[in-house]
């Protein structure tokens, strides 16, 4: 019978590694700390584990750590001596997963991966961008070479129309017509500046193709002169195409361009 205020305490029961039940008050002592399992739960017992055996006990599974000294009270620790570390029992797979998570989060490794990863991505992006830019520049250079070759061809054809002596020279008075035939519409001042640039140091009244070609190529590439308005071109074509065929032959175009009197661009009728 329990008296007033008394409570019956249920003995705690542990299961040792062999599967046997060991309870408080039973013969012998529970197994070593770290291998206790509470009956029915399978959980390891920590702070609620049963008391350690007295000094000198030979119970299996209990080892005296460096903190125990003969004659000292149980649990007393030697000053400056670290307590022994207990194995956490982490499996290799769990440890690998933890290390992978640590690498991804950067925690505990002395750096912030949130800063390093974007920096790495930026470097990779710049490297990839550099390769793309190099490829793009290669294509652009190849395209420009094609464009320059086309310009050279057009300039040569327009120049040859007025090279009556076939000696790679034209009359300086024909330069304006040649430039306009290439789709440019310079002002009078721009035309005078160009002629001054391509003329010889001692003006002869003629312009050599070798000096005209690079200057005119640069003008076409940089589009220095405003283009001839489309309505002007259309009106000129309608005047020249008197038969209303919708096209002009090369001979007709040369004839019209080399006529001394020129052609009026006023609409007929």
Swiss-Prot record:
Compositionally biased spans, kind Low complexity: 54-76
GO cellular component entries: cytoplasm; cytoskeleton; sperm principal piece
Record-linked CDD domains: EFh
Protein name per its UniProtKB record: Dynein regulatory complex protein 8
PROSITE patterns: EF_HAND_2
Primary role: Component of the nexin-dynein regulatory complex (N-DRC), a key regulator of ciliary/flagellar motility which maintains the alignment and integrity of the distal axoneme and regulates microtubule sliding in motile axonemes.
GO molecular function: calcium ion binding
Family (UniProt): Belongs to the DRC8 family.
Subunit text: Component of the nexin-dynein regulatory complex (N-DRC).
Predominant subcellular localization, coarse grouping: cytoplasm
Compartments, record wording: Cytoplasm, Cytoskeleton, Flagellum axoneme
Keywords: Cell projection, Cilium, Cytoplasm, Cytoskeleton, Flagellum, Repeat
Region of interest (Disordered), residue spans: 1-113
Cleaved signal peptide residues: none
Encoding gene per record: EFCAB2
UniProt cross-references to SMART domains, sorted A to Z: EFh
Top-level taxon: Eukaryota
Domain EF-hand: start-end pairs: 150-185, 228-263
